[in-house]
Amino acid sequence: YQVGVVGATGMVGQRFVSLLAQHPWFHLAVVAASPRSAGKTYEEAVGSRWAMPDPMPEQVKNMVVLDASHVEEVASKVDFVFCAVDMKKEEIRALEESYAKAECPVVSNNSAHRSTPDVPMIIPEINADHVAVIEAQRKRLGTKRGFIAVKCNCSLQSYVPAIHPLLDLGVTKVLACTYQAISGAGKTFATWPEMVDNCIPYIGGEEEKSEKEPLKIWGHIENGAIVSAEQPTISAQCIRVPVSDGHLATVAVKFANKPAREDILKAWASFGGEPQKLALPHAPERFI
């Protein structure tokens, strides 16, 4: 598959570029970004801002950056795009829908469409079946092939998978406290020196996302939309900490009836999903 990264010069875009460099299924054919980067080689556009631990892949250095707003041009060169633009939410929604309407599927790292009822928010091991809602989304957008799918808030990925296998044991409440690295804000210590030896006890919007997004992931499709689950009740507190990469979560879970320790361990050990069944390239053999 020929793929593109829209928003390729930012920190998340760089991560996509790094992950795609040696991917066995996907060939990085297009890097796109803002007009100020367009026309430059990727190496020129990113320069000293390359923030990944591995060197910039050789095959991308001399690729010419396209203008992300030139949707038809980008879409004509790829089978689908990964989107990691840094823009206002309204602008992101419009841009992603433009790509979808150009019959170019969009896999988005952004939060702009996470609350859109017919846009699936996927953790593949948990709710791969939610891709069925794409049929309704295509009807709304008037597309045959184009669609938008999104990933959830990055901090949720650390603990929602651990809670999911326990839902059948009667989880009623979740109390989560996340300690989130500065990479989640698209920053490094070089670009955010104020975070050295510092903590920010509140991250605007993160608590709301952390309380709502898991319920959409655990929801079901009804009348062409994803209806969020009503349980469990989730309360979250999100703190920015002086760590470069990697989020930490401390989570307390309440059950209707306390399960045995052995039942919890068994649920974790036996849980897997479609990525494990299909042996996908980046899927861990054991999910938890």
Language-model regions, residue ranges each:
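N-terminal Rossmann-like NAD(P) cofactor-binding subdomain of oxidoreductases
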Residues: 1-202, 231-233, 262, 266, ...
